[in-house]
Amino acid sequence: MSDKTKKRIDFNKHFKIANIFSTCAIIFCLSVFFLKGLNLGIDFKGGTLIEIKSESGDVNIKDLRSSISNLNIGDISVKNFGTKQDFIIKLELSSKNNSENVNLIKNKISSYFNDQVSFRRVENVGPKVSSELINAGILAIALSLSAMLFYIWIRFEWQFSLAAILALMHDVIFTLGIFSLFSYEINLSIVAAILTIVGYSMNDTVVIFDRIRENLRKYNHFNIIEISNISINETLSRTIITSLTTLLALFSIYFVGGEILNGFSFAMIVGVIIGTFSSIFVATPFLKFTNVTQKTVNKEEK
């Protein structure tokens, strides 16, 4: 082994611990998911969204939330939207007359701000539409996973595609489990975040897989474990720089972007961290169980 390949971090000795961690984490996330469920937003369970602007200055969200909760018309969510004068109210779908509930909220808001308020929009999502959105969200995630599987299968071999899909499923389950644990609201923006996570994680995995394929041709006398370790080290600087710069932007959105963007940015932060982890400690070690060798690469070239 050359000096270049000697001075490396030995990821091999950490694979077992990482696999134990991943297995326990997935079991925990699945348990939380099935026992606690997901906190679905009005996009998926129906309800009403009201966007409002205060004409009398900044809004005290806590005080406003306390005032509206006295109406006793169901679960109501109040969040800042953009500036400190803008906010949105989300009212879950109920068996009562929805228009009456909306009017009650409007009257309460008008009274709270002494009529110095403007109602910018009112959107209703019925049970049929919410059901269609749930199906569309599940279909979008399933199709993206299938497309990734097909892409990896064509570009590499079936062994690589299985490893990649395993890592992607790991990332999605972990992210949904964390959302269930902390009761973050699941809406369409979270579905978009999950699809972005799938693409980000796949990109990380493909970079490592491409280097593994290249090194399988280069180091004929090494096994897949040694090749994997060399390949991870060779792409490590790229992985760290990409992940850190992405996380820097996401943390900025989380802390500065306002409450309305917290869910999306939180999902992306979790996804980037776990996606980077899975590309190294889930997808790559799995290759040894699929008997990837130099012959696999040579067969691919023919």
Question: What are these model-predicted stretches?
Answer:
Residues 1-302:
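A structural signal for conserved, well-ordered secondary-structure elements
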